[in-house]
Amino acid sequence: MPKGNGKVIAQNKKASHDYFIEDTYEAGIVLHGTEIKSIRNGRVNIKDSHARIDRKGEVQLINLHIAEYEQGNRYNHDPTRSRKLLLHRKEIDKLIGLTQQQGYALVPLKIYLKNGFAKVLIGLGKGKKKYDKREDLKQKQMKRDVDRAIKDHMR
C-alpha cells in the first residue's frame, strides 16, 4: 500500500495553504494507553501541530491534540503531550540536513489508520509568503470561474 493510503482520521487542509510541500514521509506514532481508541473515534486535531527533531535525533510531534477517551479511567492520557514519530535512521538523517536550511519545517498532513496502526504523513514544507498565498487564491478562483462557465455552457 503506498504511503498516505488508509482510513483517514484527520487532515491538515491549512498546510497546503501555508507551505509548499516538497516531500512527504510516512511515520508511525508512539501512543500510550487510550490514545489509539480516541484516534479510532476521530477525536484528534492536527491543525496547530508540527514536528521537530530533538538533540537525540528523534522526531517529535508537538501540539497534536488527542482528546481523552470517554470511557477511560483515571489513567487516561495527557491530550497535548509530545509524541515520538517512528522513522528510519536514513530518513531522519536526511530530514536533519533539510530542516536546518532556512524556512523549512516538518508539517503533519494527515493521520490515518493502516493495517490497524496509526500513521502520520509528514511533509517537508517551505513557508509561503503572503503574496504566494494570494496568488494561489487567485488561481483557485479563476479555475472555479472557468469550471462554472463550462458547466453553464454545457446546459
Swiss-Prot record:
Region described as Disordered: 132-155
UniProt-listed GO biological process terms: trans-translation
CDD domains the UniProt entry points to: SmpB (cd09294)
PROSITE patterns tied to this protein: SSRP (PS01317)
GO CC annotations, alphabetized: cytosol
Compartments reported by the entry: Cytoplasm
Record's keyword terms, sorted: Cytoplasm, RNA-binding
One of the record's GO molecular function terms: RNA binding
Principal subcellular localization: cytoplasm
Top-level taxon: Bacteria
InterPro entries registered for this protein in UniProt: SmpB, SsrA-bd_prot, SsrA-bd_prot_CS
Gene3D superfamilies according to UniProt: 2.40.280.10
PANTHER family: SSRA-BINDING PROTEIN, TMRNA-BINDING COMPONENT OF TRANS-TRANSLATION TAGGING COMPLEX
Summary of the function given for this chain in its UniProt record: Required for rescue of stalled ribosomes mediated by trans-translation. Binds to transfer-messenger RNA (tmRNA), required for stable association of tmRNA with ribosomes. tmRNA and SmpB together mimic tRNA shape, replacing the anticodon stem-loop with SmpB. tmRNA is encoded by the ssrA gene; the 2 termini fold to resemble tRNA(Ala) and it encodes a 'tag peptide', a short internal open reading frame. During trans-translation Ala-aminoacylated tmRNA acts like a tRNA, entering the A-site of stalled ribosomes, displacing the stalled mRNA.
Record-stated family: Belongs to the SmpB family.
Protein name: SsrA-binding protein
Species for this entry: Oceanobacillus iheyensis (strain DSM 14371 / CIP 107618 / JCM 11309 / KCTC 3954 / HTE831)
The organism's taxonomic lineage, starting at the top: Bacteria, Bacillati, Bacillota, Bacilli, Bacillales
